[in-house]
Amino acid sequence: MDIQASLFVPPLLGEVFWEMERFFKLKEHGTNVRTEIMAGLTTFMTMAYILAVNPLILTPTGLDWTAVFLATALAAGIFTIAMGLFVNFPVALAPGMGLNAYFASVIVASMATDTPISPAMGLTAVFISGIIFIILTVTQVRQMLITAVPDSLKHAITVGIGLFIAIIGLKNSGLMTIAVSSFNDIQAFNFTPVTGNETVIQLGSFSNETVLFTVIALFLIAILMVMRVPGAILFGILGTTVIALLTGHVDAKTALSGQTWAPDFTKLNFFHFDFAGVFEVGLITVILTFTFVELFDTFGTLVGTANRAGYMKNPEEGKKRVGKAMFVDAVGVSGGAVLGTSTVTAFVESSAGIAQGGRTGLTAVTTGVCFLLAIFLSPLVALVPPAATAAALIIVGVLMMQSVKEIDFSDMVYAIPSFFTLALMPFTYNIANGISFGIVSYVVLATVANVSGKGNKYKVHWLMWVLAVLIIYRYGFLGGH
């Protein structure tokens, strides 16, 4: 058997490899078992940081660290394997950056108000958004929504989320400080006038150890990325953790206190929902934001990875595969909420595995198995200092900024809405605000340009009008917060 001979494996293992080749159609896609497994490991290394970062972001909401860690590993493992087995696609899924931050910010912000939102309500909102996404996928409405929003605005959403993530990293690290009022005061709308203040946002003090270790982590990750080391973010986090342990910044005994190598599945927030609370508090906007962002984020990631893997050479086959992948992704959103984590989405880091030659679902299955094995490594993740994960957030923001070059800033009809979108997300600490102002301003400017004849005939899809009216109603009559 050629597979067995080329890999020097025992007969039984050779038969297993042969079955893998047959099931995943490896020859048809010009790949082999070894290449796929190596690609899967590469993808895992590039996105394993989510195991440390997701618990860091979600625990301020009141969710238990261990529960979030287990939910993250399980959701990533289960739905990445599902992507590999049912779609034969080399794409991995995990709780997404940006939406996890939005999830946390909505809950934390509500703590200072008369209508606090519980983690159970937040998970319910994620679950409902997943159901909506499934319906949109099955009914093909998702295609209409995707074509309705101008490309520049789609890219601005990606950039805005990147800046939003970077702001969180800068804040958590202490590199960025706000010397006006506490977060709770601001979110309770007890605003301090700042028009007379020369500086609102300031650089943190380098006498703070966390700030210093964040800078170390940033340079370490950046150098590894410049050297094109696969898994640069993960290795940067690990390197910073080792330095923190050696210098005493992290005390291993304290960090490992109460940790166990055997996963405690009883801590999982399984089916931790509160449907009545969601509609009592009025989380419709939050649900729609989850759905809206997930829609474009997933579409962009899946089309981009499908293109890199060569599936779009046959447009019909490519569209069919992306459609199936979107369905698995949609199920993953609700499935992740059932397990107790924020929105699960396709990871753009999957392109790292594709660059290593991954072409089939075997790449995804390998990545998924790695995530399931990581369940037994929670004590090691507990050693990771906040500075390392904060640096990872900042670097993820850098990576998402790459989409800015796709925005047409030469045309004000696209430039102004795009700027509102990407600027308001980080500076109002709310993804929904950026999307809302972007959509409304585009509809207004495109309509004025069309009616006045001062510009090209800009396409304003009827769905954009519907969204604009709903947004104006929300901010005008329901309050903008």
Predicted regions span which residues?
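Transmembrane alpha-helix interface/packing and boundary motifs in multi-pass membrane proteins
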Residues: F79-V91, A222-R228, T289-D297, D329-L339, ...
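Helix-loop-helix hairpins and the membrane-proximal interhelical loops
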Residues: V16-V68, T199-L203, F235-G323, I472, ...
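Short helix-coil transition sites and intra-membrane helix breaks within transmembrane domains
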Residues: M45-Y49, F86-G96, F133-L136, R228-V229, ...
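Membrane-embedded alpha-helical modules
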Residues: T115-G239, V365-H481
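Transmembrane alpha-helix boundary and packing residues in multipass membrane permease domains
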Residues: A52-L56, T72, T80, A101, ...
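Loop-to-helix transition at the N-terminal end of transmembrane alpha-helices
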Residues: G62-I81
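N-terminal amphipathic/basic-hydrophobic helices that include classical n-h-c signal peptides
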Residues: M1-W18
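Helix-loop-helix junctions within the multi-pass membrane cores of secondary transporters/permeases
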Residues: E19-N54, A75, G96-S105, A109-I161, ...
